[in-house]
Amino acid sequence: MKKTALALFAGAFLANDVSALIYKAEETGTQIDFTGSARLQWRSTANKTSPVNGNTTRNHVNQAVRDNGSRFGFKITQQLGEGFYALGRVEWRFQDLASSQHGFDHLYDRHLYAGFGHKSFGELTYGNMATITDEVKQTDLANTLSLSDGLLPYAARHSIQYTYSGVEGLKVGAFYAGHSQRSSNGLDLSNELKDIWGVGATYKYKIDGKQSIKTGIGFARDRFEQANRPAYDRNAYALGLAYTYDKTTVGVDLERRITKDQTYVGNKRIEKEIRTVALQKLTDDLSVYTMYAYKENKLNAVSGQNDTKRRNNQFMVGSEYYLFSDYLKPMNLKLKAFVEWQSNHIKNFTNGNKSSRVRDNVTVIGARAYW
């Protein structure tokens, strides 16, 4: 007897804007998932800039409640038999291109890809997608003020990617993408991408029932076109490590990126990042966390141009709480609120001399619903 299951789950959040749809046809091996999240934030910023030769300026802004990267999309999986399957995904995201108060004025496709896979042989996909190098960092947090954007590419357009997860705890992959005039957020690049490729691997080892270690390592190289000049290239390296004991997780990321010949042949830019995180789950629903990052961006310019250096010490503390978990979990929904505070202590140098000092403080209160 043929069986076709159709499940529709709905939950209340922001006037019932959130819902989840799952379709599964057992006789055909087809499954369609409606995925996404609604994200809102209220943000307050305070800036103090103190030039060495000039007047100190201060600025304080309280923004209206606005979008914080809301998204929705579909995932499709088709079983082909003998362990093989086909898959596809599309995801749209909102972004603010018109300086509106709400931030919902523009919609673009963040993910759009398809491919084939096998649980023993890996997965091959093509399109606009997150890359394996996005998984290398081990300090990233899923809220707004995470300090771990990182130096490795997190996504690529018109890319082909292969990943393998046939060994327990291990995931390895590689990707390549050719020419693109747009970034992963759909906006035009100031210098068009000539090509990009990268490799990455993560491994999670479970020590016992309470302890585990996860590591990540990756490399990426991209090249960009320049008007009336040769293309310039960037090479990025990253290593991440995280340790979990019961409800406590600590992690560290080390990253470095070198850019050569940007703007002028002979220019060399070196970027370094050291990031740390500590997260403590107080209950199943409540967590507190903190991050620290040291970031350096140094330009060794050709003769006749200024050498520059920027040092940034970043601090962040935050807490998140999942609401109504017992009621929403049966409907495949999650609703959380969070509050975060970030402080940036920046020093700028020109030709070895300090040119300015900047203090940036940001506070965010947010809410997210996942389905």
Language model: regions and residue ranges:
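Cleavable N-terminal export/targeting peptides
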Residues: 1-29
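Outer membrane beta-barrel
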Residues: 22-42, 60-181, 193, 203-206
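Short coil turns and loop connectors of transmembrane beta-barrels in diderm outer membranes
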Residues: 28-30, 80-82, 120-122, 168, ...
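Residues that define the transmembrane beta-barrel architecture of outer-membrane proteins
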Residues: 30, 58-70, 107-110, 154-158, ...
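Transmembrane beta-strands of outer-membrane beta-barrel proteins
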Residues: 32-40, 82, 86-88, 124, ...
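Transmembrane beta-strands of outer-membrane beta-barrel pores
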Residues: 40-46, 92-96, 128-132, 176-180, ...
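Detector for outer-membrane/organellar transmembrane beta-barrel domains
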Residues: 194-322, 330
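Outer-membrane beta-barrel "beta-signal"
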Residues: 317-323, 358-371
